[in-house]
């Protein structure tokens, strides 16, 4: 039986390769930035990182991280409730809460952990969760761990969300929570949070938003999709990451009212049984929030880059998904074409990744480009020119 198990895995891997669905990990030998070095020593322009504000290799963050290690050490060798809470952890939690307009915040090792430890902790069998169909895998997995009755609604479809809310209430649900991404990361679409909050008010439901692809750069002050949609103060729970716009390292958080956060500290298993966030990351994250609040220069540069890329790619004839976001998916349809396109682009010095099933539905393969404040206008033009040449070679555009 053991031999059969390993043979099955071997067969599945071979099938994935044959169908063009096998994901290869490419090696980077430099720091994460707009211009990176790959394993063969060549330099390429990176258009597939979550490095929205270009801070992943910023000297001020590196200095803050080093200072954090000098003052608070390398690691805590403990979970938070035993001997793993430093003053800097509390400072970061307070700053995150204030920045997001929430009462309190709690740190996790990742946003995956924040979502994984949220629903089961707060809701029981008599409750209901209504989740957007395109929510991140961490929300999906977190919901699966919860005993609450589960409902799903079509992406951003307020009519279907209302139908599910009616179902939950008619079934006698005690507490009802609507869970949605703030930005749907495969499409670059911002959630209709105003519609969600209006329905939540109508049906007395809670609202939870995973804002990993928004906090730091979406909204007038970069506070996230709830600021962009003008619903600050109407979202009950916000989860997010420190691993994208806010420095790009690792770490996650949940922000909510104090009683929610305090209960998570008592019962959320990923929080209780994971080591504390490293002092270097905590110190750098505090610095990031200071930089984001200091001005809009990085956000302005990011949005200018996103506009330039979208306009030039549309003019070249490409089909693009999303709108009003730094995620700009180039739709290709076929998984094999997406992978070949990405390989050819790397030969041209443009570093991207093809996304295909099971990450996206079959027939909706794409190259998800992501703009950064670190990109220059010249780098964006160079990328569009490379896309255009290869797109014509592969018959994607005329």
Residue ranges with predicted function:
Residues 125, 145-147, 203, 234:
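Short, structured coil segments at secondary-structure junctions
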Residues 300-309, 314-349, 359, 363-364, ...:
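Conserved PLP-binding catalytic core of the aspartate aminotransferase-like
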Residues 118-137:
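Conserved PLP-anchoring active-site segment centered on the Schiff-base-forming lysine
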Residues 59, 63-67, 71, 98, ...:
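PLP-dependent enzyme catalytic core of the Aspartate aminotransferase-like
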Residues 51, 151, 155-209:
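Active-site phosphate-binding strand-loop segment of PLP-dependent enzymes
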Residues 79-85, 93-117:
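Short loop-beta-helix segment that forms the pyridoxal 5′-phosphate
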Residues 9-74, 205:
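N-terminal "arm"/small-domain region of PLP-dependent enzymes with the aminotransferase-like
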Residues 203-206, 213, 218-324, 337:
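Active-site C-terminal subdomain of aminotransferase-like
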